[in-house]
Curated annotation (Swiss-Prot):
InterPro entries named in the record: Tachy_Neuro_lke_CS
One cellular component term from this protein's GO annotations in UniProt: extracellular region
Protein name (database record): Tachykinin-like peptide-IX
Residues the record lists as Pyrrolidone carboxylic acid modifications: Q1
Tissues expressing the protein: Expressed by the venom gland.
Modified residue annotations for Methionine amide: M12
Subcellular location: Secreted
Keyword terms: Amidation, Pyrrolidone carboxylic acid, Secreted
């Protein structure tokens, strides 16, 4: 689930 990473990178 890269979705978690997607939202994480969204912060950046």
């Amino acid at each position: 689930q890269k979705k978690d990473k997607d939202r994480f990178y969204g912060l950046m």
